């Protein structure tokens, strides 16, 4: 099937920045360079441009100076054997422009089409399969950097993306240790970079060879952020600003920022809060999220195209388990101590399972850039707004031996119901896992003897950060 070739065409005098914009929009990591008569001059990839930027070449430079002037091409009379002969010699080739006698582009074969052709020749396919540079069967071209990829959300997202065939790079300081990625560290499509998002040199190293960044690496949660306010501002705001600026400079234009529904603070009369509702952050954590959102969106220029995701409160099992999240905590208390203590209880919280949250991030990665550029999405489901009392009641119903105690002290002021219609309408995303699913999986795991060391500070962000600060 022929493509809309115009999506790939750039003029030989176009700048690197203009060409990168075209590459981002066609979504295939390549542009075809033509002259004023639309005759083929060469091709360039996003990787070529990013390597040039690292070398100090200006974004205003003409693409003619950078393009590959002698790429492998096909003529319009090509046969499947022509394609297989080429791929035998160049098994990592992902694109083949098809030219007519006048050197005008008639089509371009992309990765999946090349594989479909070569699969019909079993002997060739065997050679490709055994090659160290074998071609992947899916069209997944994106190379994803996840900062905080060993964290509660990141370790789940990393696995989901690897299962879908993506190449994933993780930049993580590993303050909670390496165990969350231990079982997948030998995956050939995973690159692990121990590093700190506060260090520019680590950022520059990590963003090379990627075209999408998911930024998760921050101090997470109100109590943890309150321990060292200066460090929170440095990591959650200043470092976030630096990594976003670096991505813009190096033309990594699909940037996904993990914000939080806590930026809304408190709902009025149980109003459903949508993306344009007034924000009212009640903590340093929430304020830094909101400031980061504004700074990141302020960097958008029509080419750098960030997306802001305001996460609902997360629950469920993860390779980097946490027991300082409301559903996880109350379930733990019910199973291990037989008692659930709720402070207040009338506060509303939107909830989402960590696996569903990772699915939502993947949906943003896979969406056409025009659908998600410079957008803010609440991430969750309307049916998953609960009061803390509702959560306690669900646990009590599932595990009736546990007692529920309500205390009218130390009441959390955060109270918000959130509207998630936008992400459902624009991206057809809905959570698939229920509150009951999350409670049951955690309870079952606890009953099987997992997390017997549940009091260990490693499961609680604030305790672990405080302990780490004392050590340092």
Describe the predicted segments one by one.
Residues 241-284:
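Conserved Rossmann-fold NAD(P)-dependent oxidoreductase catalytic core, especially the SDR/UDP-sugar
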Residues 9-28, 34, 53, 73-94, ...:
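The conserved cystathionine-beta-synthase
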Residues 266, 280-307, 335-336:
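Active-site Tyr-X1-5-Lys
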């Amino acid at each position: 099937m022929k493509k809309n070739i115009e999506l790939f065409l750039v003029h030989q005098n176009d700048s690197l920045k203009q060409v990168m914009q075209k590459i981002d929009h066609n979504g295939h990591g390549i542009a075809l360079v033509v002259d004023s008569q639309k005759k083929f001059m060469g091709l360039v990839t996003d990787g070529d441009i990013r390597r040039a930027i690292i070398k100090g070449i200006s974004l205003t430079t003409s693409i003619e100076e950078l393009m590959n002037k002698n790429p492998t091409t096909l003529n319009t009379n090509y046969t499947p054997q022509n394609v297989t002969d080429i791929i035998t010699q160049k098994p990592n080739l992902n694109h083949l422009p098809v030219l007519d006698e006048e050197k005008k582009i008639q089509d371009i074969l992309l990765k999946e089409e090349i594989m479909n052709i070569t699969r019909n020749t079993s002997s060739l396919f065997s050679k490709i399969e055994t090659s160290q540079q074998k071609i992947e069967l899916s069209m997944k071209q994106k190379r994803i950097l996840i900062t905080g990829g060993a964290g509660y959300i990141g370790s789940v997202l990393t696995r989901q993306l690897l299962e879908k065939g993506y190449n994933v790079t993780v930049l993580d300081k590993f303050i909670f240790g390496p165990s969350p990625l231990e079982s997948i560290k030998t995956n050939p499509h995973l690159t692990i970079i121990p590093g700190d998002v506060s260090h520019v040199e680590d950022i520059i190293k990590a963003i090379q060879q990627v075209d999408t960044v998911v930024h998760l690496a921050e101090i997470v949660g109100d109590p943890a952020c309150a321990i060292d306010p200066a460090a929170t501002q440095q990591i959650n705001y200043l470092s976030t600003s630096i990594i976003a600026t670096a991505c813009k400079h190096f033309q990594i234009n699909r940037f996904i920022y993990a914000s939080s529904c806590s930026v809304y603070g408190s709902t009025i009369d149980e109003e459903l809060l949508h993306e344009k509702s007034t924000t009212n952050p009640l903590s340093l954590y929430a304020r830094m999220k909101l400031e980061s959102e504004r700074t990141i969106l302020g960097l958008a220029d029509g080419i750098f195209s960030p997306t802001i995701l305001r996460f609902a409160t997360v629950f469920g099992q993860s390779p980097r388990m946490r027991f300082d999240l409301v559903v996880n905590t109350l379930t733990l208390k019910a199973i291990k101590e037989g008692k659930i203590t709720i402070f207040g209880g009338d506060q509303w919280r939107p909830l989402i399972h960590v696996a569903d949250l990772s699915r939502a991030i993947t949906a943003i990665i896979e969406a056409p850039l025009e659908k998600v550029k410079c957008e803010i999405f609440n991430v969750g489901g309307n049916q998953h707004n609960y009061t803390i009392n509702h959560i306690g009641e669900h646990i009590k119903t599932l595990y009736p031996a546990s007692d529920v105690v309500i205390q009218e002290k130390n009441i959390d002021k955060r109270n918000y119901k959130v509207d998630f219609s936008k992400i459902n309408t624009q991206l057809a995303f809905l959570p698939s896992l229920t509150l009951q699913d999350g409670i049951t999986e955690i309870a079952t795991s606890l009953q099987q003897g997992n997390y017997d060391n549940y009091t260990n500070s490693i499961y609680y962000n604030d305790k672990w950060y405080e302990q780490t600060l004392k050590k340092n």
